[in-house]
C-alpha cells in the first residue's frame, strides 16, 4: 500500500495514542519503553508514550518495531493499527525491521491475507524473513497456489531460496498433490545443501507420505543424520496415511527402544491410529501406559486418539472411561466417542451421545446418521436431517452420503434420490451409497443404468460398487448381467472377489434355481470353507424339493465346518419333513441334541415412518 492510501486508511487511528504533553528524561523513557516491550507490558509502554511530548522521544525504527512486536505478542491488533498509522506519518515504512514487524502483526492478527499482502507490497525493503512470512501466511491460510507464486516472485527479484521458503514451497506442493513439482523442490533442497536440515526433511517426508509415496518418505528419513522426534513422527505419519500400520508400529518401537527418544503427542497420536486400525488392543493399552508415564495423557488430541483406538478395538467401556476422565472435551473427542459406539453396533448409545453434545460438528452428523441407518430409524434420521438443514449446512459430502445410505436402507428411495440429485460434490462413497440404495430397493435396472453412467463419467468402480451391483442383479433375477459383472471386476478392474461378492453370486444363482452352478462356483473359491456362504445356498436349496440331494450335501458340509451352527440342522430337518423323510428329520433333531446345538430365537424391529 503506498503512502497516500496508508494515510487515508489510518488517519482515523493516528490520534488515538501518543498524545503530546511536555516531560523530561526522554532517553531514559525510551529505554524504559523498550524494556516494557520486552516484558510484554504494552499498556504501561503506551502510558509513558502518552505522557511524553512527541519531540522528546524520536520516532526510531527500533522503537516502532518493538511496539509492533509487543502488539503481536499481547494480541492487540487495534493498537497495532494505531502504531501502523504513526509509522506511515513518521516515514518509517521503508525500514526493513519495521516492515517485517508489521507483516508479522497482520499475518497473526489481521483480518486476512489480502490486508497482509497490502503491507507486504508497501515501500519497505524485503529480506528473506519478509518473503518467508508471506509464503508461510498463504500456506497457513490454505492458499497454496499463491504461496508458490510468491516463491516465483521472490526468485525473480534475485533472492535465493532458504530452508524456510523451500519448506513452505514443499508444504504447498504437498497440499496441492503436486508430487512432481515437490520433487523439483527436493532437488533444489539438495543443491543448496539443506537435505541435512531436520525441519525441511520432515516436510519432504510429509510431501511423499500424503501423496502415496511412502517408499520415498522412508528414503528421505534414512538419509537424515540423527533424526529428531519430529523427523521420526513425519515418517511414522507417512506410513500410517498409506495404511502401512505394521511398519508404523515397528518404526515407533525402533525410535522408543532403539534410539531412546521420547515421543511427543503427535507421535503417540499417530501410533495409536495404527493400533486402532490393526485392532491391536494389547499394544494400544501398552502405549496408553507410556502416555501416562511420559505425562502426555492429559493432552486433548492424544486423548481423542485413545478414544478412537479403544473404539476401533471394540473396547467401548474403556473409551468411555478415558472420555469421563478428560478435563477438556472438544468436538473431536465427542466425535471419537460417538464413532466408537457406532462402530461397535451400539447405535442407541451413539444416538444418546449425540443428544448430549452441546457443539455438534459435521462429522458428528455423519456418524449419528450411520447409527440411524443401523437401526433403520428413519424418523430420527429425518429429524437429524432437519437439524443439518437448519444449520445452513449444504454440500457436505460425508453427511449427505450418510443420508443417502440411511434413506436407502430404510426403503425411502425417493428421499435418497432427492438428496443425491441436490449434491454439488460427490465422491466414491456417494456413488456407492446411491447404487446400494437402488440395489436394496429392487431397482435393479436403474442400478445397472446408474453403474454404467458412473463408469462413463470416469468413476472407477471399487470393491463396494461391485457388491452393490451384484446385489441389484440378484434381487431382480438378472443372472447373465451378474455373471458378466463378476468376471468384469477381476478382469477389467483388478478387484479380487471377496466373501461378499461370492455371497451375492451364490444368492443370485440360488434364486434362479442354478444350485449346482452355485455349488461349483463356491467349491473353486478360496473362501470355500466359510460356512456362512454355504448357508446362503442352503436356504433356497432346502426350499426346493427337486434340489434335495444338493441341499443334503451342503447341509452336511456346513455341519463339518461349523458343528454348532443350528440353521444347517433346522433347514435339513425341515427339508426331510417336506419330502416325506420323517425318520431322517427325527435323526437330525436327535443329532442336534447330542451335539448340544441350541436353536437361537430370532428377533426383529421396525421403525414406522
UniProtKB/Swiss-Prot annotation:
Keywords: Repeat. Residues 533-609 are annotated as: Type E motif. Transmembrane segments: none annotated. One of its GO terms (biological process) is RNA modification. The keyword S-adenosyl-L-methionine does not apply. PPR repeats lie at residues 25-59, 60-94, 95-126, 127-161, 162-196, 197-227, 228-263, 264-298, 299-329, 330-364, 396-426, 427-461, 462-497, 498-532. One of its GO terms (molecular function) is RNA binding. PROSITE patterns: PPR (PS51375). InterPro entries: E_motif, Pentatricopeptide_rpt, PPR_At4g14850-like_plant, TPR-like_helical_dom_sf. It comes from the Eukaryota. Signal peptide: none annotated. PANTHER family: EMB2261, PENTATRICOPEPTIDE REPEAT-CONTAINING PROTEIN. NCBIfam families: PPR (TIGR00756). Belongs to the PPR family. PCMP-E subfamily. This is Pentatricopeptide repeat-containing protein At1g03540. It comes from Arabidopsis thaliana (Mouse-ear cress). The gene is PCMP-E4.
